[in-house]
């Protein structure tokens, strides 16, 4: 079992906090089988609030379960409880871990941010729900503070973590 952290980096303009709408946020990931190295071409969605029970060895189920098409190995991924963290203005421009995945047989290799982010603008400004970061940049107008808010140069990477 390997723990993998999803790190993001972005330049924030008049934004105090960027976070997923966990536990209902769907992380869209491309995965690689740790056994044979086969990498999926399709996006798989993993949501903390959803569990699948494909394996009789784990009655609680998993957040994600798949069988490798190449080697037939059964792989699963869970989102580590309470591992979700916001990306804040203090983090702007640097990579920060926002969620940790517990991986058994499959590892994430690519992340697509898509819709479902929450943005809190600076100085107790407007809250934005269901923000779509699929274009890697997002701009809106904060009517409460009469200024623009934005997220630019969104990037992500995965890092292996020690337990």
Swiss-Prot record:
Keyword Membrane: no
Binding site for Zn(2+): 33, 36, 68, 71
InterPro entries xrefs: CXXC_Zn-binding_euk (IPR008584)
Metal-binding is among the record's keywords: yes
Pfam families in the cross-refs: CXXC_Zn-b_euk
Superkingdom of source: Eukaryota
Keywords carried by this UniProt record: Metal-binding, Zinc
GO molecular function, a single term: zinc ion binding
PANTHER family: CXXC MOTIF CONTAINING ZINC BINDING PROTEIN
UniProt similarity note: Belongs to the UPF0587 family.
Domain notes: Requires a bound zinc ion for normal folding and solubility.
Protein's recorded name: UPF0587 protein CG4646
Organism of origin: Drosophila melanogaster (Fruit fly)
